[in-house]
C-alpha cells in the first residue's frame, strides 16, 4: 500500500512515525532587533492563523484581518488547510487499507447514524458561525469606514489649520517687509498701516487651502515640514582627530501613541494621527457646562429679619448663604471676624444687601409683640366676676371683714394678727354673685403691695375704723385707688364699739376728696362690723351694683393673660405663683411667661386647695411649673411654643441686669462725687442676707431697710431670696461677714449644721416690726457717737518755772470751777486758742492731786507742749459721748 496520502482522502490512519494531533504546528521565525550602542536581540516571531468556517470568498476577505503578527521571512510555507466536507452515509464504504498495510473494518449501522448526526450538527453549527461571522464582518466594515471618515475629517481639519497658520505668517511677513521697504524709501505709510493686518481670506478661496477629502493638498503647503523634521532628527558628532559622524535618529514605533497617553483598539489598528477626545475631557466639559448653567441661574432674594445684634452664623443661616462667604465679604471690607462673633444690625444690613437680600429690622422688644393686650372678639365676650381689693390702715379690720365674708378665719393664721402678704380668694355672695377678693397689707412697709393690688382690681373697698378715723395708710390707699382709676366703696368698720364715730370718718374723708353719698357725693358707703357680721349682705349688694355699672366682660376663648399677685418658693413643690387670670382661660399644660421666668403649667390650685384643669377670667389660682420665682406684679401670658418663651424670658432677664447696672452707675455718681466721697470718711455698711417665705414680704423688707440708710451707715443687702436657708446662704453670710435673717422660713438641716460649725447666728422673725427694729438698733451701733463738752473750770498762769527732766511747769490759780487731772484743756492767749491737749501733771505743794478747786493755787504741765506764758488762761473741760440712733 502506498504511503502517499491523496488530497481527497479523509480516512483516519495511524502512522508509526508521526504523532496524531488536533491542530497544526505553529509557524515560527527569528527576527533580530537592533538597539542603540550596537546592541541587538533575537526575537522569535510566531504567526498564528485562526481557522474560520465559511465560504471561500469570505475567508479570503477576512484572512488579512486575522493576522496578529506579520509572517517572518524565514518561516516555511504552511500546508494547505483541509476543509471538512459534509458527507452522507448513504451506503457502506468498502474496507480500505491504511498506509501501514492494516485493513480497517467497516462501520456499523449505529456508527454511521451517529456519524451522520454529528455531521448534521456540525453543518448547523457551521451555518450559525457563518452568519455570525458575516454580521461581525459587516459591523467591522462599518466601524472601519466610520473611523476612516473620522480620520479623514481630522486630517482635513489639521491641514486647514496648518494652511491658515501659514497664510497668517505669510501675510504678517509681507506686511512687515512692506513697512520696512516704505520706511527705507521714505514713502509715507498708507492709512491703516499701523493697524492690525487684515484677516486672512476664507479658507475656501485661499491658494493654500486644503484640498477636498481624498485629494492630496498642494506641495508648497506641507512640503517644507518633513524637511524640517528630518533636519531636527539629525545629530552631528564632532570629535578631535576623528572624522565627523552624522547620526540619524530612528523613529520608534508606537512612540507617538505612547506620548499621547492610553492606546485604544481603534488607535492601535488604525493609522490616525490626531488624538480623539478622552472620557475625562468629556466629563470636564460637561461639568463646566453645568457650572455655567448654575452661575447663570437667577439668585433667590430673601427677606432677612435682623435683630439689634446677631451672630455671623445666624445671619448666614437666615440668608441661606455660607458663613464663609459672609466672612469673605467682611474681610474685603477690612473686618476680620469669626462665625461666632456678634455684629450690630447696621453691619448685618450692609452684608445682607450686598448679597442681594432685603432686610427687615426689628428691635429686641419686638419679641413681646402680640403677647399682651390683643383685641377680643365681641361675640366671645361674657360677664366676669368683679375683682375687689380690700385696703386700709393696719389693724382696721380688713382681714377680719374678709373672713366674715368668706366664713373663714385668716387672722388667726397671720403672725401678730397683721397681714404680711397678699391673699386672693373667690367667694359666692348671698345673692349668688361670685366675687374675687384681694387682701392687701396695711403696714407702711407694704406700699408696693397696695399699689400692685390697686392696679389689678376693679373695685376698692376702703376699710376705715370708726373709732380710729383716717390714718396715713388710709390716705395712701386712697391715692393708689385714684391713681389706678378704680371706684371706691367706703366700709366704716367697728361700728359696734362704744367709741365709734362714723360721722367723724365721713368728715375726715372730705380732706382727701372722697365725698360719700350721705354727704351728697358719688362714693358708696356702708357701716359694717366684721366681728358682729353687721351689714355684710349690704356690702355685697353694693359690690354687685358697682360691678353692674362697670359692665365687666372678658373672653374665655383666647390665650390667658394675668398678673402675679404673690410668689414663693415651696420646698416640695418648687416655685409657686399666685396668679389672677384677667383674660382668657389658663389650662394645665400651657406654656407661660411671667417676668424673666417661664415654664409649663403643671398644676392649678384654687384658694380652697382644689386642683383644677383650667381657670377662667377673674379667678385667682396658684400656678406650679415656673422655672423660678417670678416677681409680684409681673404680667403672665401664654405663648405658643417653648422657643418664644425662652426668647422672651432671656430678653427680660437681660433688661433686668442692664437696669441693675444702670442703678449702680447712678449710685456711683460723677467724678466730683467720687472725689468728695474719698475726702470724707467712708460710709459704714451693715451687710445682710435675707430669706423670706413670699416675694411680697421680701420686697417689703428690702424697701423698709433701704429707707434706714444715711450718709454714715447703710444696710447692704448682699442677697435676698425666697425659700429656706441653705448651705450656700450660710457660706455667703460667713464669707461676707453678714447677718443671716430668716423671715417666716427655717434653715435646712445642712445649713443649720454648717452655721453651728461656723459659729454663725441665724436670726428668725415672723413679724416685720421686730425685724426692722433689730436691724435699726444694729445700724445705730455703727454710728459715730455725738461728742458734748462739759466745762469744768478756768485757771490763770501766774508764773512759769523750768524744771530739769520735767520741762516747763505753769504756776496757776483756779479762778472758777475746778481743774481735774487727765481732763482736756485749752490754752488761750489773747482770747485765741493756741493749744488743745490734756494735763499731764497737777500738783499742789509738791503733791499729786486729782483736782483743785477755785481760789487755790497749783502747778500744771501739758502733754507734749511747753510754750506757756504768764497771763495765759487754761480752760479745763470734759468730753462726753452720747450714743446716736437712726
Curated annotation (Swiss-Prot):
GO terms for molecular function: GTP binding; GTPase activity; guanosine tetraphosphate binding; translation initiation factor activity. Residues 529-531 are annotated as: G5. Residues 383-553 form the tr-type G domain. GO terms for cellular component: cytosol. It is found in: Cytoplasm. Residues 50-60, 107-181 have a biased composition (Basic and acidic residues). InterPro entries: EF-G-like_DII (IPR053905), EFTu-like_2 (IPR004161), IF2_assoc_dom_bac (IPR013575), IF2_II (IPR044145), IF2_N (IPR006847), P-loop_NTPase (IPR027417), Small_GTP-bd (IPR005225), T_Tr_GTP-bd_dom (IPR000795). Residues 493-496 are annotated as: G4. It comes from the Bacteria. Residues 439-442 are annotated as: G3. GTP binds at residues 392-399, 439-443, 493-496. Keywords: Cytoplasm, GTP-binding, Initiation factor, Nucleotide-binding, Protein biosynthesis. Residues 417-421 are annotated as: G2. Residues 1-25, 50-229, 253-272 are annotated as: Disordered. Residues 74-83 have a biased composition (Pro residues). CDD domains: IF2_eIF5B, IF2_mtIF2_II, mtIF2_IVc. HAMAP family: IF_2_B. One of the essential components for the initiation of protein synthesis. Protects formylmethionyl-tRNA from spontaneous hydrolysis and promotes its binding to the 30S ribosomal subunits. Also involved in the hydrolysis of GTP during the formation of the 70S ribosomal complex. Belongs to the TRAFAC class translation factor GTPase superfamily. Classic translation factor GTPase family. IF-2 subfamily. This is Translation initiation factor IF-2. The lineage of its organism: Bacteria, Pseudomonadati, Pseudomonadota, Alphaproteobacteria, Hyphomicrobiales. The gene is infB.
Amino acid at each position: 500500500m502506498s504511503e502517499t496520502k491523496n488530497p481527497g482522502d479523509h480516512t483516519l490512519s495511524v502512522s508509526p512515525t508521526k504523532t496524531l494531533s488536533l491542530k497544526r504546528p505553529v509557524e515560527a521565525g527569528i527576527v533580530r532587533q537592533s538597539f542603540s550602542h550596537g546592541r541587538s536581540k533575537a526575537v522569535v516571531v510566531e504567526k498564528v492563523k485562526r481557522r474560520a468556517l465559511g465560504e471561500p470568498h469570505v475567508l479570503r476577505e477576512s484572512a488579512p484581518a486575522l493576522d496578529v503578527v506579520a509572517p517572518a521571512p524565514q518561516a516555511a510555507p504552511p500546508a494547505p488547510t483541509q476543509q471538512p466536507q459534509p458527507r452522507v452515509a448513504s451506503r457502506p464504504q468498502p474496507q480500505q487499507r491504511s498506509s501501514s498495510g492494516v485493513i480497517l473494518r467497516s462501520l456499523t449501522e449505529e456508527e454511521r447514524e451517529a456519524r451522520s448526526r454529528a455531521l448534521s450538527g456540525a453543518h448547523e453549527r457551521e451555518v450559525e458561525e457563518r452568519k455570525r461571522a458575516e454580521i461581525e464582518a459587516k459591523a467591522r466594515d462599518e466601524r472601519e469606514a466610520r473611523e476612516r471618515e473620522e480620520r479623514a475629517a481630522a486630517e482635513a481639519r489639521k491641514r486647514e489649520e496648518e494652511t491658515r497658520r501659514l497664510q497668517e505668517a505669510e501675510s504678517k511677513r509681507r506686511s512687515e517687509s512692506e513697512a520696512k521697504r516704505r520706511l527705507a524709501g521714505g514713502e509715507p505709510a498708507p492709512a491703516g498701516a499701523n493697524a492690525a493686518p487684515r484677516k486672512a481670506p476664507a479658507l475656501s478661496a485661499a491658494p493654500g487651502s486644503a484640498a477636498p477629502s481624498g485629494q492630496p493638498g498642494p506641495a508648497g503647503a506641507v512640503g517644507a515640514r518633513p524637511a524640517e523634521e528630518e533636519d531636527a532628527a539629525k545629530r552631528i558628532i564632532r570629535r578631535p582627530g576623528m572624522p565627523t559622524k552624522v547620526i540619524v535618529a530612528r523613529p520608534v514605533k508606537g512612540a507617538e501613541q505612547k506620548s499621547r497617553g492610553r492606546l485604544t483598539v481603534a488607535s492601535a489598528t488604525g493609522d490616525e494621527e490626531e488624538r480623539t477626545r478622552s472620557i475625562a475631557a468629556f466629563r470636564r466639559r460637561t461639568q463646566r457646562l453645568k457650572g455655567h448653567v448654575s452661575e447663570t441661574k437667577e439668585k433667590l432674594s430673601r427677606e432677612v429679619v435682623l435683630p439689634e445684634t446677631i451672630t455671623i452664623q445666624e445671619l448666614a443661616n437666615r440668608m441661606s448663604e455660607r458663613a464663609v462667604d459672609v466672612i469673605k465679604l467682611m474681610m474685603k471690607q477690612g473686618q476680620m471676624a469669626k462665625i461666632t462673633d456678634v455684629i450690630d444690625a447696621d453691619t448685618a444690613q450692609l452684608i445682607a444687601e450686598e448679597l442681594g437680600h432685603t432686610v427687615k429690622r426689628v428691635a429686641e422688644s419686638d419679641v413681646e409683640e402680640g403677647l399682651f393686650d390683643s383685641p377680643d372678639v365681641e361675640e366671645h365676650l361674657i360677664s366676669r366676676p368683679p375683682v375687689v381689693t380690700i385696703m386700709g390702715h393696719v389693724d382696721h379690720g380688713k382681714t377680719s371683714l374678709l373672713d366674715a365674708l368668706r366664713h373663714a378665719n385668716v387672722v388667726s393664721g397671720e403672725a401678730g394678727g397683721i397681714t404680711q402678704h397678699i391673699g386672693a380668694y373667690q367667694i359666692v355672695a348671698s345673692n349668688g354673685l361670685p366675687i374675687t377678693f384681694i387682701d392687701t397689707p396695711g403696714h407702711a412697709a407694704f406700699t408696693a403691695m397696695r399699689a400692685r393690688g390697686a392696679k389689678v382690681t376693679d373695685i376698692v373697698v376702703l376699710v376705715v375704723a370708726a373709732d380710729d378715723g383716717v390714718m396715713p395708710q388710709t390716705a395712701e390707699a386712697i391715692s393708689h385707688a385714684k391713681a389706678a382709676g378704680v371706684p371706691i366703696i367706703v366700709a366704716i368698720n367697728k361700728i359696734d364699739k362704744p367709741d365709734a364715730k362714723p360721722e367723724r370718718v365721713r368728715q375726715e374723708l372730705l380732706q382727701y376728696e372722697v365725698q360719700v353719698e350721705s354727704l351728697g357725693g358719688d362714693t358708696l358707703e356702708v357701716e359694717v362690723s366684721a366681728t358682729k357680721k353687721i351689714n355684710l349682705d349690704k356690702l355685697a349688694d353694693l359690690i354687685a351694683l358697682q360691678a353692674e355699672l362697670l359692665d365687666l366682660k372678658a373672653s374665655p376663648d383666647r390665650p390667658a393673660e394675668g398678673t402675679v399677685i404673690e410668689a414663693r418658693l415651696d420646698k416640695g413643690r418648687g416655685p409657686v405663683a399666685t396668679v389672677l387670670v384677667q383674660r382668657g382661660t389658663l389650662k394645665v399644660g400651657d406654656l407661660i411667661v411671667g417676668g424673666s421666668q417661664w415654664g409649663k403649667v403643671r398644676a392649678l390650685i384654687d384658694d380652697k386647695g382644689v386642683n383644677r384643669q383650667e381657670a377662667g377670667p377673674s379667678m385667682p389660682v396658684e400656678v406650679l411649673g415656673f422655672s423660678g420665682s417670678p416677681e409680684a406684679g409681673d404680667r403672665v401670658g401664654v405663648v405658643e411654643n417653648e422657643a418664644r418663651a425662652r426668647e422672651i424670658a432671656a430678653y427680660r432677664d437681660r433688661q433686668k441686669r442692664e437696669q441693675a447696672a444702670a442703678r449702680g452707675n447712678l449710685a456711683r455718681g460723677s467724678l466730683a462725687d467720687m472725689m468728695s466721697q474719698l475726702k470724707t470718711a467712708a460710709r459704714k455698711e451693715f451687710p445682710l442676707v435675707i430669706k423670706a417665705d413670699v416675694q411680697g414680704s421680701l420686697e417689703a423688707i428690702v424697701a423698709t431697710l433701704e429707707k434706714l440708710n444715711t450718709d454714715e451707715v447703710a444696710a447692704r443687702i448682699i442677697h435676698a431670696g425666697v425659700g429656706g436657708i441653705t448651705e450656700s446662704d450660710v457660706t455667703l453670710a460667713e464669707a461676707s461677714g453678714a447677718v443671716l435673717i430668716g423671715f417666716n422660713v427655717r434653715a435646712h438641716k445642712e445649713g443649720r449644721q454648717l452655721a453651728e460649725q461656723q459659729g454663725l447666728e441665724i436670726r428668725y422673725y415672723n413679724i416685720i416690726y421686730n425685724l426692722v427694729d433689730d436691724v435699726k438698733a444694729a445700724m445705730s451701733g455703727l454710728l459715730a457717737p455725738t461728742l458734748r463738752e462739759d466745762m469744768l473750770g478756768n485757771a490763770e498762769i501766774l508764773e512759769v518755772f523750768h524744771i530739769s527732766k520735767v520741762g516747763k511747769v505753769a504756776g496757776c490759780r483756779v479762778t472758777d470751777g475746778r481743774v481735774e487731772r487727765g481732763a482736756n484743756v485749752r490754752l488761750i492767749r489773747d482770747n485765741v486758742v493756741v493749744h488743745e491737749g490734756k494735763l499731764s501733771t497737777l500738783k499742789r505743794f509738791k503733791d499729786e492731786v486729782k483736782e483743785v478747786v477755785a481760789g487755790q493755787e497749783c502747778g500744771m504741765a501739758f502733754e507734749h507742749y511747753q510754750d506757756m506764758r504768764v497771763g495765759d488762761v487754761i480752760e479745763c473741760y470734759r468730753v462726753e459721748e452720747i450714743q446716736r440712733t437712726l
